[in-house]
Each structure stands twice: as structure tokens, then as C-alpha cells.
Amino acid sequence: MADKEFDFVAFDACLMGSVEIADCMEGRAGYVIASPELEPQDGYDYSWMTALGDSLPSDMEWGEAVGRSMVDAYDAYYASGTAPVAMSLMDMKEYPAFHEVFHQYVDGIPQELREELYRELGKDRMKMLAFGSRQAGGSPELVDVLEFLDACQSVYPDESALQTLKEGMGKLVTDQWAKGYPGNPSGLTIYLPSGSNPYLSEDLETYDTTGFCSAYRQLTDGYAAYLARESGVEWGNINAHKDGTVEISIAPEDVSDVTGAYLAVFCPVGDDGNYYLLCTDSDVDIGVDGTLRAAPENSYMGMKGQVLCLIETMNLDAYTEYMAPVLYNGELCTMRIGFDEEHEDGQVLSVTPAGQTSEAAKQIYELKEGDRVTPLYLVEHMEDVEEEPVDGAKDGAKDEAKDGAKDEAKDEAKNEAKD
């Protein structure tokens, strides 16, 4: 690498708008342009290159001029879609100051508070803006930097440090554009381990090689160890009430070990003990007495009269997001659906291939008239549940069986899909 840094470095790739990437590019680029989200299949709109032929504004460096052109072109190209998309421009001369305060804050979290912090991170996970692909039973492992810091504040409040970090973030992310999110992203993501990741230990070994903030890597190691800890919680029987609510009890002393719970609603299929999963819902009240209480929905979203399998991936105060496994024009995909006041019946945000290849990760489809959609269902085999048709308080939906749609569902889905 030459002593002189690049004027700018741009990543026409998915999920590169992270604080870890910023750390890697310190001293190597004056400006970094990257997306914190999955990029649609078309990637960049290269009309931004017109900035290279324009005269440089008197108050702007080349890296900044090109970066702003990239953000504007991305905005114009993807403004009409519904899929969440984002692009950020980082002024790298601001990174050292941001990292210094970030390191000091994370390093200063007392050891005696870390167990409580790990619990809070688990509880707040579904409330954080997350980025990347969503799979059944899993959580994206990239979250908004400022939302992670807000979660830390609930355990280790330091308003002065938080304000300094927010100001530093505003200088570091000098320009950005985002759409399709329930809130306003900060422009940068950060890695936060998920207990649903079967390759967590291997991923952490890789993460340690990035050289990112040593204080944060120590925190993620501790959080991962917490996630991997065997649960000793004994779950009681499920009780269904006439008002529709269901309850399950645990020992009061075990309440602090439960960071979150799901109500999972199943529908019986035939007489062989198989059940289709209809939805998961994290709106579960966890009482200090050890009682977990939830109420199933009265109705569930469907298309052409066929109910979808809705697996919750985000649950904010005024917004809930789900993924639904489907066959989209014959391809195994995940449909992303959001609910808010404006879209009480749900809005299909995007459809993405379920494959794990880099090619699949870059493809984002938008549901359009004429598409063929076949709902798919996760299947659970349960014995002796005739008197308890509703199961709940699960850590998440299992994804061992992605198919199982009824033949009539396939026939229904051959009709035109709704927008």
C-alpha cells in the first residue's frame, strides 16, 4: 500500500457500510462510500461517474464530491421501490475521534454490569434496526450502531458520552440516504452476535481477526459466551383461557434468565401429529412471578385466500416486520412483510432468494402483478397435543422443514399475486 491514501473507496457490494469496515479503511481512504444494507441486484447506478467530469466545487474534495454523487444516484435509482435500501458516505478523517470515544465508553462498562447488559441486548434485539437477510429462527447480526449504544445506555447510562458519540457519528457519516425503514438509520452498522447462529464460535474467531476495537471484541466474546450458556429453565404446562390468552409458568427465580419469549401458533395437518407453523409473536408479557402470558391474533395475513407463515423478525412500538417462506415463480424465497398504522393489512417489502450464495444475497425482487406465489410452512411434529392446539413460548421457529404447502395452496398461488 502506498503512503498516500486513496481519495475515495467505494464498495458496490452488500453490507459494507459498517463501523468495522470504516476501521479497516482508516488511513487508506479519505472517503468511503458503502451500503449498510443488502444491495439490490442492479447494485450501483453508475451515472454517479458524471461527477468525475464536472469541475470540483471550491469547498469540496474529490472524494466528497464523488461520494455525494454516488449517494444521490443511488437515491434516484431506487426511490420508487419498497425494499429497504441505504447508502452512506463516510468522511474518514472523523473516524479516529469517533472510535476513541466509542472505545472508552465500551471499555468503561463495569464487569459487574455486563451480565445485565447481555440480558438487555437479548431483550432489545427485536427492537433494534437490523440489516441483512432474515432466515427462519434467526436474527440478522448487523444492527444500527446508535441503537446498540441506546441499549447499552439502559444499563450503563452516560449521556455525555452518548451525545459525543452521536455528534461524532454525524460528522463521520457526512451524507446518507435510506428508505424502507421504520426509523432513521444512523448510516453505520455494527456486528452483534446472535444465539441462533450455528456457526457463532467460528464467526467470532474470524471477527477477532478484523482488528476492530479491542474493547468491543471483548464485549462480543462475553456476549457470545452468555448466549451459548445452557439454559436451566424448566417450563411448565401451557394453559389456554376462554378469552384466547395462553399462559405458561416458570420459577420466579428463573425470570432473569429469560431475555425473550415467542408465542408460536400452529395449525394441525392430518392425523399424524404434524403441525404447520402459522406465526411467531414476541408480544409476550413476562411477569415477575414467572408467568408468561400472550394472546394469539384473531386473523392472519394471506394471499388469494391462503394464509402465510409469518415469522417475526422485528418488533418496534409502531412497526412489526415478518418473513414468510414462499415459492416465488418456482424459486425458494423469503417474503419480507411490514405492518404499521399506514399498512394495517401488511405491506410486502421485498422477496429475496433463500439461498446462502453471494449471488442469492444480492437479488431482491419486488412482488408484481402476474407473479406466482406459493406459501410454504415450517412443520413441527408434536405428540399428544389434542387438548392444547396452541404451542408457545419458544425461542424461535425451527427451520428443519421449509416445504409442506398443501396442494390446494399451490393451485391458489397460480393466480395473480396481489401487489
Model-derived segments and spans:
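Intrinsic-disorder/low-complexity detector
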Residues: 389, 400-401, 405-417
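Terminal, contiguous helix-loop blocks that mediate binding/assembly
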Residues: 1-394, 398, 418-419
